[in-house]
């Protein structure tokens, strides 16, 4: 099975360098989000929406052998990788668009981590998740809550805590529990240029400068974030549920 090239769009654990601090931290915080979700799953059927290459779905299935886990992703290569590398008796994968995926059976819990900022129509994803959710079900989702558009070309939206919560409110889903994470920047290789990357974040500084040339006002947003939070990216994972449940 061919491992796709290094990008900032999806994480493939076999690509990550255990000797690189940024790679180690990236995998750690992603797995910690899944661990947060895994210990809060409810009901029998769980959907991992936009599951990527499947390492997170595998984590959910491993820690919840009594539940059926379904991983959905739009990328056929990611689903093929998941099927080849992350299989368990209670885990299946489907190649489908997160914004339009349908299922005859509802899901008791839907997990979608670091997905919303990648999509052109975030509200359409939340609307679809709400439609797929069983009565009394919950959604566990995450987004970055510091600027990321300058450093990651696959991110289409920035969110604050308030704007993140606002996506779910029209569907009667309110935040019940939150989990915050910090990832400090690693500067090694930030402006490196090579034909092929040695790690995911290599050369990101070049993309950042190019972004500011096209979007100079965004630099003010970045500076404001740096003054408040330092050289870090911050992430928020939240469990949403109807308050009447």
Can you name each region flagged by the protein language model?
Residues 1-105, 109, 113, 123-126, ...:
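Conserved N-terminal segment of class I S-adenosyl-L-methionine
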Residues 114-118:
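A short His-aromatic
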Residues 124-135:
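A short glycine-rich, Lys/Arg-flanked "PGG" loop and its adjoining helix->strand segment in the class I
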Residues 137-143:
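Conserved beta-strand signature within the Rossmann-like core of class I S-adenosyl-L-methionine
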Residues 151-156:
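Short, solvent-exposed loop/turn segments at secondary-structure boundaries
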Residues 170-191:
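Substrate-binding/catalytic lobe of Class I Rossmann-like enzymes that use SAM or dcSAM, i.e.
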């Amino acid at each position: 099975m061919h491992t796709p090239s290094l990008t900032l769009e999806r994480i493939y654990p076999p690509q990550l360098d255990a000797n690189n601090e940024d790679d180690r931290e990236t995998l750690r915080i992603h797995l910690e989000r899944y661990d947060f979700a895994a210990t809060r799953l409810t009901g029998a059927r769980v959907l991992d929406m936009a599951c990527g290459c499947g390492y997170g779905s595998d984590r959910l299935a491993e820690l919840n052998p009594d539940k059926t886990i379904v991983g959905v992703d739009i990328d056929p290569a990611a689903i093929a990788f998941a099927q080849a590398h992350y299989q368990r008796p209670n885990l299946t994968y489907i190649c489908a668009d997160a914004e339009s995926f349908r299922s005859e059976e509802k899901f008791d819990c839907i997990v979608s981590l670091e997905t919303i900022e990648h999509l052109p129509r975030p509200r359409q994803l939340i609307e679809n998740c709400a439609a797929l959710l069983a009565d009394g079900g919950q959604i566990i989702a995450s987004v970055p809550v510091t600027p990321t558009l300058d450093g990651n070309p696959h991110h289409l939206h920035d969110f604050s805590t308030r704007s993140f919560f606002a996506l779910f409110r029209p569907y009667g889903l309110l935040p019940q529990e939150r989990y915050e994470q910090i990832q400090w920047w690693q500067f090694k290789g930030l402006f490196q240029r090579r034909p092929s990357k040695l790690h995911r974040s290599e050369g990101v500084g070049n993309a950042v400068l190019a972004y500011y040339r096209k979007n100079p006002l965004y630099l003010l947003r970045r500076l404001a974030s740096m003054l408040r939070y330092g050289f870090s990216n911050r992430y928020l994972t939240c469990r949403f549920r109807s308050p009447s449940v």
